[in-house]
Amino acid sequence: MEADGAAAAAAAGEASTEAGARPLAPEEEALRRNTDCVYFLASPLTCKKGNECDFRHSDNARMNPRDCWYWLNSNCLNPKCPFRHPPIDGMFGAPTTGMPAVSSHYAPFNSGKQLVPCYYFKKGNCLKGDRCAFYHGPQSVGNNPSEQVVKVSSLPLEQLQTQKNDLLGIKDSVQSTNSIQHGAPITNERGKTAVDRSTVNSARTATVAIPVASNAMSCPKSEKVKSSTPAALKESFTTSSGGDHPECYQNHFPMDSDPVRDWNQSYEMPPADDLPQNSREADELLGESSPGFDVLVDNDADGAAYLHDEDFGGDMYPVEDYEYAPADFDVRAHHERERFNGMDEQDQMGHMYDGYERKRRRSSERSMERPFHSERRFLQRDRDRVEMDGSDLRHRLRRRRINESSLAISPERNGEQRRRDERYRERAHGHRSHRDHHQSSRGSTLSSRLQGRIKLPGRSPDRVDTRSEKERDRRRLRDRLSPVRRTEFQGTRHREAGQHEEQTQRRSSELALGSRNADGQHLTKDVPDSHNFPHRKNSRDSSKANGSVEPEASLDFEGPKPLSVILQRKREAAWANGTSACSPKQDKSAEVSHRQASLAEAEKEGDNIISSDEYKSGSGDEEFRDEGHIPVEGHGQSSSHGDKLEAEDIIEVDPVENQDADNYDQREGESYYEPIEGQDYKSDDENAYEDDDEEYDDDDDFARKVGVVFS
């Protein structure tokens, strides 16, 4: 090998010197560009020219010791070929002596190769080189491959083996080739030719196939995996005697046939009886047939897409849980579904989910009985449209909308739902027409809507009574307010004349009592704290702002009284009011003058001054309520001027507006005068009539009214 390389380098040097003497043709220059530089192949540093070198400098070819087969046959067109391009004899016009002919050296390597071209060699990068089991060579169109094989096989086998051993050293491959060639075939019970198992094992490990001279070709295991349809071979699967599963797949081919002719023949499918079934049907190997195949055979191809659509196949035009009646409607199955869903009972959920159950049942039936249902489904086109009026989509939607509105307001929706389900089942049987059913359903739903409106539940009667009672109490309190505030803010003047007379008479009696208290008849009872009874200065200021300024008097404050004392004083006050109402009018001027004198004296003496309208405010009476205390009338003494009067703590009461108002106030249990504990209360007017005691004996009624006022 080293001698051959030196000779090639010398030939290249001579060619370069000759080329320098004469100009090179374009073909020769291109050929030189594709020839590897021998100095660069030895080492990149040995070529002194570098990039100016006329030969090819390829790192891949330098690392790859294999020569390019196409280059040796003068037809390598790959400028980046990873194989070596050595100098060829006669390339540069001077034949090299001592180097054997290229064709004689490289032709024998194709003798043992298959006729299958190497895929990687066509791509220009087969790393196996001459050891590849596939064909490395040009794909000649005009030449017959059989003739080339005959020419190659004419050389002696021993000479070929010695040349390969000398050049490439592949003695092991030749030995494996000989072992495969001399393998003895065996015959089984069926009389079929089979390859010896040892021969098969050696063929699996070997990479070089049998030579063509034996008129037999083998396909290696790698080729079996790559090619789905092996060419020029007829496969038959043989098993051991009595075995269910094949031990191995073995290749059989006629020994006297031409392998090239068998290569061009088409691959024949083995019989279905010899194929392993693995407990499956034979048609499963070919794929499952279309579900609508029987329909397509009957020239009903227009429903093929309909059959393949699972969602569209069951219900023709679904709208929520309503749909057109299918052609395969089964009344018995429908009633079974109704019984399953609880349609016979008063169950609304069964009716709601009935559509879902029908759809699910249809899907299962469609998967189990597809051809039968498909045939019956196509018979629907011949049905009369009159039969489908009962399942009209518009009627269903209208009926559903009316039923939903009636169910929302009708308290008898369970009974109505039950009747509606019964009508639905009768329509399924065909006992009632669409028009009668429509009219009855419309009439029943309208009547149910009217019943629902009439029986619409209202608020609780307890709450209504409580609220109305509170409103009445508030109205009564507003009616009992002072006439001054009513005339100033409400503008009601129809009772003003009678009220003025009664107010004048009551003030006279109160001034007499105030003068007696101012002379020294004060209370001996302790006065409570000021925070329990706030000052009434704000009430006096408000009365002055309203324009009703009354004379003032100094009155002592008494404090809280028990309920029995208050009721007793209430009766006495009513008795005193009756006597004052009968007094003549000529005494008014004297009483007013006496009251003004007492008020002037009180302004000089006392520090705590309260207005008469604070406890009376036009009617002469007030009720002070502070945290559960019983109202106390205006014979008291305020604690200080600094206390503030809360507006909600003072309720001005008009006890006597007329005879009806007086009786009303007496029933309400309001008190107007309270006697001092330990002393006897005597009015100036002793001539009074006795009031009806039956209206004031109910203490509990008065306590309840007081609680209502606080609330």
Curated annotation (Swiss-Prot):
Residue ranges that the Swiss-Prot or TrEMBL entry lists as coiled coil: none
Swiss-Prot/TrEMBL keywords: DNA-binding, Metal-binding, Repeat, Zinc, Zinc-finger
Domain of life: Eukaryota
Acidic residues compositional bias, start-end: 648-663, 686-701
Protein name, entry field: Zinc finger CCCH domain-containing protein 32
Feature: compositional bias, Basic residues: 428-437
Zinc finger (C3H1-type) in chain: 31-60, 62-88, 112-139
PANTHER family, sorted: ZINC FINGER CCCH DOMAIN-CONTAINING PROTEIN 11A, ZN-FINGER, C-X8-C-X5-C-X3-H TYPE-CONTAINING
Compositional bias segments (type: Basic and acidic residues): 364-376, 413-427, 460-509, 585-594
Region: Disordered, residue numbers: 1-23, 221-246, 339-376, 405-561, 573-701
Feature: compositional bias, Low complexity: 1-21
UniProt cross-references to SMART domains, sorted A to Z: ZnF_C3H1 (SM00356)
